[in-house]
Amino acid sequence: MSKMKFESALRYKEEAFIKFKKDFGHAYGSQTYHLLDFDRFCLAEYPHKDTLTEEMVMRWSVIKETETSNGYLSRITTLRQFGKYLVMMGEEAFILPDGLKGGTMPLMPYVFSPESLKSFFQYTDTMERYYQSTVRHLVAPVMFRYMYCCGLRPVEARHMNREDVNVQTGRVFIRESKYNKERVVYAPNELLSLTKRYLDQISAVFPESTAMFVDRKGQYFSKSTQQYLFEHCRDGAGIKTSGTRRPNMYSFRHSFATHRIYQWHKEGKDISTLLPSLSAYMGHSKYQHTLYYLHFLPEQFSEMSGFDFERFSEIIPEVYEE
């Protein structure tokens, strides 16, 4: 390790931080390697930047596909401590948010690109009537749009009643959610016009059913039926696995959160002050669960550069607990 040295514009601050840690009895072996890795990143990407900024921290803090949970957490913890040290010394620095727990780091989620999202809904919108189900081609375009536009869990979409959606105000009551935590969200206007037409069509076929999204018998979707329909649409749209990431029904929810945070970033808004609203909207039991998306987001920036988010500007309004 004696042959390794810090070379970026942050080198003097990094060396002082390592000395500070060792002076207090910390071996700081693997942590030094992490900081050296960050230093090489800064030398290549920010050769003249001597301030620890949010952009450089977030770009380096993306979990790698081959990285274990423990390895990832060790790496970002080192950078978080470096940021705290700089602030303690009176320096301006971005501190990586706390909240990640060992053993609970999920795999990198699949996030729909603009092209894949467009392909998926183009397929659902042009599905033909299936001989074994008179409504499948009607349900798919609406149910999966609710999962994306409102960030719903698959089970939340399955349990929706027709009376849960107010097509005049956009108010959507989410029942039987995870942790038995009911909540209210609001659907964007673009989705409401589609919903009105859908309800008219479904009511004509199954007038007695209370389910929002019905199977071929007019009953609530089962988990397996919903999964089968998603896979049928995904494969029909030609959406493939990306690296180790495979699109699943939760990808709509991951995409909703990631696209929303990206839009805030694009608009120059303070993401840290808006995350609690997103956390409540999505029904997260802990604010830390929402923080995960901050660590997955930088990798998606280049893929989403041409995405039009303006029509989803109403996706996250006030959240009401009931």
Task: Enumerate the predicted regions with their spans.
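Conserved catalytic core of the tyrosine transesterase superfamily
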Residues: 1-322
